[in-house]
Amino acid sequence: MDKKELFDTVINLEEQIGSLYRQLGDLKQHIGEMIEENHHLQLENKHLRKRLDDTTEQIEKFKADQKETKTQKAEQSDIGEGYDNLARLYQEGFHICNVHYGSVRKGDCLFCLSFLNKK
């Protein structure tokens, strides 16, 4: 191998090393961008999970409130029906108090009236 061939080989190796160095720099930059994107995606994922949890809690609370409201309405309608029946009996002239329940009433009874006013 003469000096010219040796010199050409060294120049060729230098060009290859330069090319590899540029490729390594590009790869390093690409990895940095991927790491940054991964970090942003992790933060976004964390925020979305928090929003999902908050929304799920709100939905569960809303459903529980609706169920409680239905239960209360059912109880109120039951209470209202019984109250109406007792008020009707009192208007028809019967006692509805625990002292004289069912007996014929002569005038107003304070016990019956206090029961009707409890509502």
Curated annotation (Swiss-Prot):
GO process terms (BP): DNA replication
One Gene Ontology CC term in the entry: nucleoid
Cell compartment(s), UniProt: Cytoplasm, Nucleoid
Keyword Thylakoid recorded: no
Cofactor(s) named in the record: Zn(2+)
CC cofactor note: Binds 1 zinc ion per subunit.
Domain of life, per lineage: Bacteria
InterPro entries, sorted: YabA (IPR010377)
Family annotation (HAMAP family): YabA (MF_01159)
Record's function text: Involved in control of chromosome replication initiation. Inhibits the cooperative binding of DnaA to the oriC region, thus negatively regulating initiation of chromosome replication. Inhibits the ability of DnaA-ATP to form a helix on DNA; does not disassemble preformed DnaA-DNA helices. Decreases the residence time of DnaA on the chromosome at its binding sites (oriC, replication forks and promoter-binding sites). Tethers DnaA to the replication machinery via the DNA polymerase beta sliding clamp subunit (dnaN).
Subunit structure: Homotetramer. Interacts with both DnaA and DnaN, acting as a bridge between these two proteins.
The name this protein goes by in its record: Replication initiation control protein YabA
Organism in which the protein naturally occurs: Bacillus velezensis (strain DSM 23117 / BGSC 10A6 / LMG 26770 / FZB42) (Bacillus amyloliquefaciens subsp. plantarum)
